[in-house]
């Protein structure tokens, strides 16, 4: 074999050894997206529900941001608030699409990044729907979760690999008796959850987590080429909110400013009030946030606020299965309540 042919052969072999594993990994990831996006997953572009295409003439597009309550944890994508809201508005003969950009564990800090990531959807109005995931109110450890940005592939291309998350959530389901929310609580608070899974389930979960770690390792290698800036909230005290809500308020204000600067309308929504002492804290948080909005933006016509705090009684098991996340009927109530404010804001 001539030196030239030998080099060609070596180059081809190296190319195959690199391309083939990535192609196989991509094919497996696309399969997992297809399998899980209709239940508890997301599509290849990182949002829940069907992929939306170029906005049509006369169509209004709405996006909904938030954490697991907006995402629709525990229900199908059709039963989540965004899909039901779309159906409510369309039933009046209006052309509208509502895209679910929420993600489990995310709080107000993520809003600005998500609004930016999905500008290409050409949305007209953004609904900001999250307070629960910022109730810790600890300025030393705010909720900096921006789940999609943990993937260098998403940051570079907009494609969100799902297989590490699917494997990790499957493992968590085995360890936490089917309650993957405990995994996210542990990630958010740092408090370890004691579980009593069987040895067999622990072994299976360990294997799944090991597989997820392989995917994470590949992404970390890619991440070295496009490192993510260290998360921070600039000048939280500028929000004017009292302790411990300054970081939360500033994150909401930052998102609203970003949206207005890009010609978007924004609807900020208070979620159903939590029960007991958590509810008292939730109401205090929301009152501080609303006051900050009014101080900063006054009578801005492209911004509206809606209080859905009393729309759903979270102690009613027919409407909420865990006193936080809603059942399909609970989500339907919120969607019905939001339809009017959304239509009014789109008409401005």
Whereabouts are the PLM-identified features?
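N-terminal secretory targeting modules
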Residues: 1-63, 75-76, 94, 109, ...
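Short, hydrophobic alpha-helical segments
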Residues: 31, 179, 191-193, 338-348
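Serine-esterase "nucleophile elbow" of acetyl-processing enzymes
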Residues: 45-104, 112-127, 331-332
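Extracytoplasmic/secreted envelope proteins and their assembly/folding machinery
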Residues: 78, 82, 86, 108, ...
């Amino acid at each position: 074999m001539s030196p030239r042919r030998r080099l060609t052969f070596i180059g081809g072999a190296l190319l195959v050894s690199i391309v083939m594993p990535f192609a196989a990994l991509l094919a497996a990831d696309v399969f997992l997206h297809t399998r899980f996006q209709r239940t508890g997953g997301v599509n290849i572009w990182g949002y829940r529900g069907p992929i939306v295409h170029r906005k049509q003439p006369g169509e209004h597009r709405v996006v909904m941001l938030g954490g697991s309550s907006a995402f629709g944890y525990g229900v199908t994508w059709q039963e989540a608030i965004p899909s039901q809201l779309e159906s409510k508005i369309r039933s009046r003969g209006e052309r509208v699409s509502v895209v679910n950009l929420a993600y489990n564990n995310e709080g107000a800090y993520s809003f600005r990044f998500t609004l930016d990531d999905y500008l290409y959807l050409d949305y007209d109005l953004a609904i900001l729907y999250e307070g629960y995931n910022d109730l810790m109110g600890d300025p030393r450890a705010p909720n900096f979760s921006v789940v999609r940005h943990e993937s260098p592939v998403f940051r570079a291309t907009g494609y969100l690999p799902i297989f590490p998350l699917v494997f990790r959530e499957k493992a968590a389901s085995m360890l936490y008796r089917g309650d993957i929310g405990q995994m996210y609580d542990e990630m958010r608070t740092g408090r370890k959850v004691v579980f009593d899974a069987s040895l067999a389930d622990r072994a299976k979960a360990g294997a799944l987590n090991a597989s997820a770690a392989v995917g994470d390792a590949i992404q970390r290698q890619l991440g070295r080429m496009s490192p993510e800036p260290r998360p921070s909230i600039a000048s939280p005290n500028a929000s004017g909110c009292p302790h411990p809500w300054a970081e939360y308020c500033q994150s909401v204000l930052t998102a609203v400013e970003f949206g207005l600067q890009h010609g978007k309308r924004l609807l900020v929504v208070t979620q159903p009030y939590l029960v007991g002492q958590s509810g008292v804290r939730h109401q205090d948080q929301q009152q501080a946030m609303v006051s900050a909005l009014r101080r900063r933006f006054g009578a801005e016509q492209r911004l509206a606020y809606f209080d859905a705090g009393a729309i759903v009684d979270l102690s009613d098991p027919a409407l909420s299965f865990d006193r936080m996340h809603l059942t399909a009927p609970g989500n339907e109530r919120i969607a019905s309540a939001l339809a009017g404010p959304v239509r009014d804001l789109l008409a401005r």
